[in-house]
Regions:
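Alpha/beta enzyme core
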Residues: 15-106
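N-terminal basic/disordered segments at the start of proteins
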Residues: 1-15
């Protein structure tokens, strides 16, 4: 494992106890707004101090998270055109490496 990967993982997984608490708010991607997650900005703000990282989509990050958010962001970079059918694995990469770098995500 190279230095950059170790550095990013150390920001997500606490080196003190080797554990992580990730707040995953990428659920709306599959089924639309989830109850209590309709206003992500209001939902995320009070929980930030309790989390080691935040998992979120690019659009939700841009619209619902302040740039001074205190914890690392793990970006969901996959997406699909439909949730119809049994198989939800019909996804592609939807975020470029350049976009991920611009967003400074882990």
């Amino acid at each position: 494992m190279d230095w950059g990967l170790k550095n990013r993982l150390a920001k997500i997984i606490s080196p003190a106890d080797n554990r992580a608490l990730m707040l995953a708010v990428d659920h709306g991607y599959f089924l639309g707004p989830t109850e209590k997650l309709e206003d992500l900005k209001k939902t995320i703000a009070p929980l930030a101090k309790h989390c080691d990282s935040l998992m979120i989509t690019r659009g939700a990050l841009r619209t619902s998270v302040n740039p001074d958010y205190p914890v690392p962001v793990v970006l969901r970079v996959s997406g699909g055109t439909s949730i119809i059918g049994e198989d939800l694995s019909q996804e592609d990469i939807t975020v470029s490496i350049k976009d991920a770098l611009r967003l400074n995500v882990a």
